Design a protein with these regions (language model features):
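Alpha-helical scaffold segments that flank or form the walls of functional sites
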Residues: 80-151, 196-211
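Divalent metal-coordination and catalytic microenvironments
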Residues: 10, 29, 34, 59, ...
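A structural motif
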Residues: 119, 150, 243, 302-303
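Active-site-adjacent C-terminal substructures of enzyme catalytic domains
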Residues: 277-321
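N-terminal metal-binding scaffold of metallo-dependent hydrolase/deaminase domains
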Residues: 1-48, 60-62
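Histidine/acidic-residue-rich catalytic or RNA/ligand-binding cores of hydrolases
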Residues: 78-81, 164-167, 230, 254-266, ...
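Metal-coordinating catalytic core of metallo-dependent amide/deamination hydrolases
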Residues: 136-285
Length: 321
């Protein structure tokens, strides 16, 4: 059944790029079955849709919904869970002690807070979504978001390297025997099987949920947390799915910048370019510690990191230093 709504406000911002010409005084927006049909003055539009339900009394501001392009869907911040902020590399260990809340709760809180703040589209970028538990939580989170009515991009994220620390293979050899045995599973595991499981989950989520309003993206968690073999498979999967978007954290801290130079012998973005991962369907979260030549390369390739700087997280993690 077709449903038509008229959103009525004192002002309707239709295109902020146009300045005053993009604002309609006494404006309204007509929506039919979830799609914007037209904009104009309420006085002109209302008589043309006599059966439409009107929301707003002419005193509100109407504006396009905001987009959160990089969120982890926690619902509560680490501080709210009892873990204070620190430098990123320290925080990764501290976060292991945060309570793990059920995904139906965290996704619901996240959706509610976003909608209340004017965000109508949310990107949930997962973190360590490997194993059966990761798959279970992904399905529940997506269903919860969709039930809330928010538009969604969802990217299951994993790391096949640097799960313990950057350069974990070198670190293992410096540890005493008892710690070495405890740390080995984080460094030495079947990476081919790990990747197979990840792409199986991605295909499952994509085939189940991807549509015009919900997008499933690929997400190596971090550029420095992915092997070259894994990233090549990510590129191949994106191509096989018609150019699906790829989202990853990039150069979030000075340590990551130094590690990339040492590991690859070149800036990280140039290494990613060798793998075909600087492209118009690749988005980077943060990308704080990039060089001028890397920025120029991203611009030439059409990569989208300038839009996803996650400034509050950057400041909280002291990553700007």
């Amino acid at each position: 059944m077709t449903e038509t709504l008229i959103l009525r406000g004192a002002y309707a911002i239709t295109d902020p790029r146009l300045g005053p010409r993009g604002v309609i005084s006494g404006g309204a927006v007509v929506i039919t079955d979830g799609r914007v049909v037209e904009t104009g003055s309420f006085a002109a539009l209302a008589p043309r849709y006599p059966g439409a339900r009107v929301l707003g009394d002419g005193t509100q501001l109407l504006m396009p919904g905001l987009v959160d392009a990089h969120s982890h869907g926690r619902g509560l911040s680490p501080i709210q869970k009892g873990v204070r902020n620190d430098f990123l590399e320290n925080a990764l260990f501290d976060w292991a002690y945060m309570p793990i809340l059920p995904p139906e709760l965290t996704a619901a809180i996240c959706a509610w807070r976003h909608l209340r703040s004017g965000c109508t589209l949310l990107h949930h970028n997962g973190f360590d979504d490997d194993g059966p538990e990761g798959a279970r939580r992904a399905h529940i989170a997506i269903k919860t978001y969709l039930a809330a009515g928010i538009r969604l991009a969802f990217s299951p994220g994993v790391r096949d390297e640097s799960k313990l620390a950057m350069g974990g293979e070198e670190l293992i050899g410096t540890l005493p025997p008892d710690l070495r045995e405890a740390a080995r599973p984080f460094v030495f595991f079947d990476k081919a099987a790990f990747a197979d499981e990840y792409f199986q989950l991605f295909d499952e989520l994509y085939d189940t949920y991807n549509n015009a309003d919900t997008r499933i993206l690929l997400a190596p968690c971090w550029a420095h947390g992915a092997s070259e073999a894994f990233l090549r498979r990510v590129r191949a999967k994106a191509d096989a799915r018609g150019g699906v978007m790829i989202h990853m954290h990039l150069l979030q801290s000075p340590v990551q910048k130094a590690y990339g130079l040492r590991r690859h012998g070149k800036p990280t973005v140039f290494w990613l370019d060798d793998l075909g991962l600087v492209d118009s369907n690749v988005a980077y979260g943060h990308a704080i510690h990039v060089t001028e030549p890397e920025i120029a390369l991203m611009g030439r390739r059409g990569a989208t990191s300038p839009a996803i700087r996650a400034a509050t997280s950057t400041c909280a993690m002291a990553s700007r230093r």
